[in-house]
């Protein structure tokens, strides 16, 4: 790979170093990695030195003054691991997520040095413009962040990362919807599933553009490519990877297309598993994409918002959903609030909530990796409780303002609380969720 990066110093002080994240280095045991061949800064030779695991430092030949920019050229090889992953390949399906050497974020406490950890979405990046040329063998189709402007050249503006997928077996379903080119890429005979994902994408864009603010890009690609076990999807700017574990075609194969077979899963709920993964990852275009956050230090911020987005989708489009005994998202949010407050619901006493929204991915990995998903529910229930107190319309107005306020920047928990305390008396509610 040949990479040219124009880095702008917005820190307010001179910089003698710039830190970088080389995520492929976390996959060396599976054959992945980044091999840096050459680095230069404004034409002068430089060196990337490992600081900690996937974090590297580039010493600048001269200090970069505040509000000035520098051009950094790199040449490096990316080794793609032979694993089923958001970064990996299997059976001529290549997923290239988080493969680019990207600058670390300089925050209020200095450089954010956060090595990759194999839980959640261990990435933290800032907004940038990308201009990427991709060469693939004849017969391969590419699904990427942004838009292909000329053959093999892809451009994306004001996005937080760049990713792509490639395969020689993709079928593409495409539709232009309200000015957005929607594309679903898939392998194999799952046309019905691809169509359902496309329909869910259209409904998600309608709903979220109203609830959060207009979708600001003109493409959205959804790739049914398969990820690791237990991971239903992964978000990238204008690109979503989905694991087609649940397929519409399964219902035909099981002979329960009409839902009459009591031995199989409820048809409504089974299809909801497809819809929920799709609408959740699309919601990340707003929460992670437009409104950024440190997904390592405070993963609840985007995951909680996107879990709440699932609730909005469910309430809007799936009002008569048969949950096959599992309970609706609203039921789960209400149960979580009972766990937090110690209240009963429908005569049932719930276990005490012990989920700490302040936990980082490192905390979850060390102490309770199986419990990590609890932040989705607790974070989502917080949004739900605020909506209940404000009322739906006032809350949506405030939610759109929240997105506008932090658009193309980042938000942390303190800023989140300050914003919402300005919209309602949530001090007691926050005291419950952060106790």
Label every PLM stretch briefly.
Residues 303, 307-381, 389, 406, ...:
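Acidic/His/Gly-enriched intrinsically disordered linker/tail segments
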Residues 132, 173-285, 289-298:
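Juxtacatalytic substrate-recognition/specificity segment
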Residues 7-11:
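Asparagine-centered strand-capping/turn motif at beta-strand->loop junctions
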Residues 75-165, 169:
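Extended, low-hydrophobicity, Ser/Thr/Pro/Gly-biased non-transmembrane segments
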Residues 15-45, 135, 139-140:
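Solvent-exposed beta-hairpin/edge-strand motifs
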Residues 32-92:
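A surface-exposed beta-strand-loop module
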Residues 283-292, 306-310, 378-390, 395-396, ...:
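Alpha-helical scaffold elements that line and support the substrate/ligand-binding pocket
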């Amino acid at each position: 790979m040949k990479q040219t990066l124009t880095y702008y110093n917005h820190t307010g002080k001179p910089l003698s170093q710039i830190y970088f994240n080389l995520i492929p280095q976390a996959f060396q045991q599976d054959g992945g990695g980044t091999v840096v061949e050459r680095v230069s800064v404004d034409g002068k030779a430089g060196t990337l030195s490992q600081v900690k695991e996937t974090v590297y430092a580039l010493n600048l030949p001269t200090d970069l003054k505040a509000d000035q920019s520098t051009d950094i050229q790199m040449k490096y090889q990316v080794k793609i691991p032979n694993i089923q992953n958001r970064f990996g390949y299997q059976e001529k399906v290549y997923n290239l997520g988080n493969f680019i050497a990207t600058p670390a974020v300089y925050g209020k406490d200095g450089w954010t040095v956060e090595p990759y950890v194999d839980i959640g979405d261990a990435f933290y990046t800032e907004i940038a413009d990308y201009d990427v040329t991709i060469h693939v063998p004849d017969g391969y189709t590419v699904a990427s962040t942004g838009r292909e402007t000329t053959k093999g050249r892809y451009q994306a503006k004001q996005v937080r990362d760049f990713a792509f997928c490639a395969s020689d077996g993709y079928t593409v379903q495409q539709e232009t919807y309200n000015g957005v080119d929607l594309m679903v890429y898939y392998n194999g005979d799952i046309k019905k599933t691809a169509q359902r994902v496309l329909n869910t994408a259209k409904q998600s864009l309608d709903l979220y553009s109203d609830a959060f603010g207009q979708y600001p890009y003109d493409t959205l690609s959804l790739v049914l490519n398969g990820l690791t076990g237990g991971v239903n999807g992964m978000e990238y700017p204008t690109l979503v990877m989905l694991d087609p574990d649940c397929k519409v075609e399964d219902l035909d194969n099981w002979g329960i297309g009409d839902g009459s077979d009591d031995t199989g899963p409820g048809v409504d709920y089974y299809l909801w598993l497809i819809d929920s993964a799709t609408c959740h990852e699309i919601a990340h275009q707003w929460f992670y994409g437009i409104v950024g956050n440190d997904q390592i230090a405070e993963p609840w911020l985007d995951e909680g918002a996107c879990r709440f987005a699932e609730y909005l989708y469910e309430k809007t489009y799936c009002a008569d959903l048969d949950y096959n005994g599992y309970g609706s998202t609203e039921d789960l949010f209400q149960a979580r609030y009972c766990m937090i407050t110690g209240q009963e619901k429908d005569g049932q006493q719930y276990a005490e909530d012990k989920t700490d929204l302040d936990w980082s991915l490192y905390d979850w990995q060390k102490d309770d990796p199986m419990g990590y998903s609890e932040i989705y529910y607790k974070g989502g229930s917080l949004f739900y409780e605020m909506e209940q107190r404000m009322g739906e319309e006032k809350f949506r107005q405030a939610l759109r303002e929240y997105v506008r306020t932090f658009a193309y920047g980042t938000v942390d928990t303190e800023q989140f609380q300050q914003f919402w305390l300005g919209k309602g008396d949530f001090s007691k509610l926050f005291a419950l969720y952060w106790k």
